[in-house]
């Protein structure tokens, strides 16, 4: 049970820190109004926020549950022979529940703001494509970027948590990787690579079209993660092992 609670808390923190920074602090208009983002975090700040949540969450909770906080990560680790299949359902359940509770919290707090609105392409930091992409990217672009970036994310995770990797640096490397992933793809899909994160905020955005696009943010990240797990275990894993000495 401790593992599931840790996954719930870690995913709650990821969504609150990442999506919360996007909702509350990405854009803060200059005094007197206008469109200048004088005090807001912008894309860079939001990307750093997502990375920092994983960085801190993994250090705090990774020793309890492994610090997945993401169904795609759980699937990728399972395919890479690092995680038992019997634990997939309870882990994913805890992750999705944590994301939903965090999204509800963001929704409640956001309503207290003077400019609260669910208008726009990505209310509550939702993920989407087409009309719901921050910069209007279409379906194929969204599918490819989510697949490829989740693949890379899992390669990083599997690599830095390998038994032969330097100890103690995994949370930092994973957090920095997630930051870079957001810098690349916020304009395209608002960056998912995490089905739980996408699901939580979509449930409270008030737009059925965004819920209708959720399938892509489950399919592409999980497919990318599964391929990464397969490739790392079957192709890359032995590359880090010492070569046996010739007799």
From Swiss-Prot:
Quote the PANTHER family the UniProt record gives.
Answer: AQUAPORIN TRANSPORTER, MIP17260P
Localized where?
Cell inner membrane
User: What would be the name of the gene that encodes this protein?
Assistant: aqpZ
Transmembrane as UniProt keyword? yes
Q: Which GO terms describe its molecular function?
A: water channel activity
Q: Name one Pfam family in it.
A: MIP
Q: Its membrane topology, per UniProt?
A: Multi-pass membrane protein
Q: Where is this site: Selectivity filter?
A: 50, 182, 191, 197
- Record's protein name: Aquaporin Z
Q: Does the keyword Transmembrane helix apply?
A: yes
Q: What does this protein do?
A: Channel that permits osmotically driven movement of water in both directions. It is involved in the osmoregulation and in the maintenance of cell turgor during volume expansion in rapidly growing cells. It mediates rapid entry or exit of water in response to abrupt changes in osmolarity.
Family recorded in the similarity comment:
Belongs to the MIP/aquaporin (TC 1.A.8) family.
Q: Where are the transmembrane segments?
A: 8-28, 41-61, 89-109, 138-158, 168-188, 211-231
Q: Which UniProt keywords apply?
A: Cell inner membrane, Cell membrane, Membrane, Repeat, Transmembrane, Transmembrane helix, Transport
**Which residues make up the annotated site Involved in tetramerization or stability of the tetramer?**
19
GO cellular component terms attached to this protein's record = plasma membrane
């Amino acid at each position: 049970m401790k593992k599931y609670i840790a996954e719930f808390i870690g995913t709650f923190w990821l969504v609150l820190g990442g999506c919360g920074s996007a909702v509350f602090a990405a854009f803060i208009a200059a005094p007197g109004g206008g469109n200048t983002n004088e005090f807001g975090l912008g894309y860079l700040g939001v990307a750093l926020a997502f990375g920092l949540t994983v960085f801190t969450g993994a250090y705090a909770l990774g020793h309890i549950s492994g610090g997945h906080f993401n169904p795609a990560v759980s699937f990728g680790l399972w395919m890479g022979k690092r995680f038992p299949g019997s634990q997939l359902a309870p882990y994913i359940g805890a992750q999705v529940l944590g994301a939903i509770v965090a999204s509800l919290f963001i929704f409640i707090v956001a309503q207290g703001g003077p400019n609260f609105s669910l208008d726009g392409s990505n209310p509550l930091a939702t993920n989407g494509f087409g009309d719901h992409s921050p910069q209007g990217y279409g379906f194929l672009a969204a599918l490819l970027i989510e697949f490829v970036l989740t693949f890379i994310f899992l390669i990083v995770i599997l690599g830095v948590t390998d038994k032969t990797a330097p100890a103690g640096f995994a949370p930092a490397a994973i957090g920095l990787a997630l930051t870079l992933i957001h810098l690349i793809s916020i304009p395209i899909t608002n960056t998912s690579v995490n089905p739980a994160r996408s699901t939580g905020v979509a449930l409270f955005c008030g737009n059925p079209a965004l819920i209708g696009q959720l399938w892509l943010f489950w399919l592409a990240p999980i497919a990318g993660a599964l391929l990464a797990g397969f490739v790392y275990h079957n192709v890359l894993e032995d590359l880090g092992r010492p070569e046996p000495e010739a007799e």
